[in-house]
Amino acid sequence: TDIEVVNQLQIIATNCGYGSTVLVRKPTIGTKDIFVVRIIKHQETYIKNVKKVDYEGIIWCPHTKNETIIARRNGKVFVTGNTPFTNITMDLIPSGQLAQQGVIIGGKIQKEKYKDFQKEMVMINKAFCEIMMEGDAQGRLFSYPIPTYNLTKDFDWDNPDYEPIWKMTAKYGIPYFSNFINSDMKPDDARSMCCRLRLDNRELRKRGGGLFGANPLTGSIGVVTINLPRIGYEAKNKRDYFKRLNKQMDLAKKSLQIKRKFLEKYMEKGLYPYSKFYLADIKKRFGEYYKNHFNTIGILGLNESLINFFKDEKKDITSKEGRKFGLEIMNHMRERLMTYQQKTNELFNLEATPGEGATYKFAKADKKRFGDDIISAADIGKHKGQDIAPYYTNSSQIAVGFTDDIFEALDQQDEFQCLYTGGTVQHVYIGEQLTSTEAVKNLVRKIAENYKLPYFSITPTFSVCPKHGYIAGEHFYCPKCDCEVGYKEGMEFNEV
């Protein structure tokens, strides 16, 4: 009946590697609540130390095999934690303005320049790749940080120092590749952030932001995503489509401007101390901390928008008529964003929104409002006739399962991918395991040299067994576990 005793019991249980929950029961006799502590076994969990802080409850400082957090909420002890979403650009050779800068050691600029440390760059990249290839304790890949490698016209494809990159790509498909081979941009012109946000630093240089390659001091204050399928469904003709699109874009612009004002106000109040420190020079020069940050507008479901607009499943983004109108829509958005930029003196860009939850939420809301009259991605292609939850395709992507030919998919997407000014990524799904690093390297090279798409990744197929970890290829059952129990491929089962 004593809450302090309950707290201590939960601490003891957690230190012993157990989870626990607390139920509160009203007494049948007396007035004190009765606390029932249930002990739950957690695998491979131990606590480094436990301490009480000035907070509503108890926070434990944990140490688990995969560096997650042990927390308690409403009496329940559970494993939690959210890995920071990080993207790092791994330069393989000292490049751009950074190569000519003196290195900083002990807080002081030295006479040696970054270009003098090629050997160390190779060592760091190799060590990074080896750690990423090991994965975690269960053989799962590390989701973050996402490494970006720049592919330029002078990229040395046969350099043996790059072999760890191709091995890492073949095993997990971890790296993203920034394609500058068929682009007028240079590596210093772009900064890759999160899973697809990619900012054009040339816009900042036009403003005279005093930026240099290693210190862009830029980002996006937020993304507003536009539901294109609803516009396509409601529009009576092309003129009406653009009228509705303009209205949604104006609302997005207004909301981002409101958010920008709030962020500036919160910054002044000291709510973002780290950002305030690093953006102090921007504030001195322009009077605003976030002057070099973009207002980002994204899109979802262009494919379904075209189908709903033409009232014809065949006129999707891959059809001649659908493709033409789809490109017209995106070019219209780019031009309108440029108009916003000129009128507001704020930076705007267009992003291929990852979607994730929004693809389902938009489709669910539209189905509730318009019923089965509006077409979602779940109603077409490989999903047709299946009872699955509604969703829309990400940004301007082709329908799921449209083709297994990666080059057909790239042919369809190349022109669309190049129209995003705020970032996009084309995931190249292999559908099988990759065993040859030479094949991986040749595939990346073929894509980079034959397409203009700015950002892409290679995604091989692999499986993870809770016991044996990483297994190349697709496996519904672990072959190593099967072998241990005596099962062989093709063996018949006897009914018991």
List the model feature ranges, each with a label.
Residues 2-4, 27, 42-44, 54-56, ...:
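Short, glycine-/Ser/Thr-/acidic-enriched flexible segments
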Residues 1-82, 468:
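Internal intein/HINT superfamily modules and their associated LAGLIDADG
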Residues 49-52, 71-72, 79-81, 87, ...:
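Generic structural "secondary-structure junction" signal
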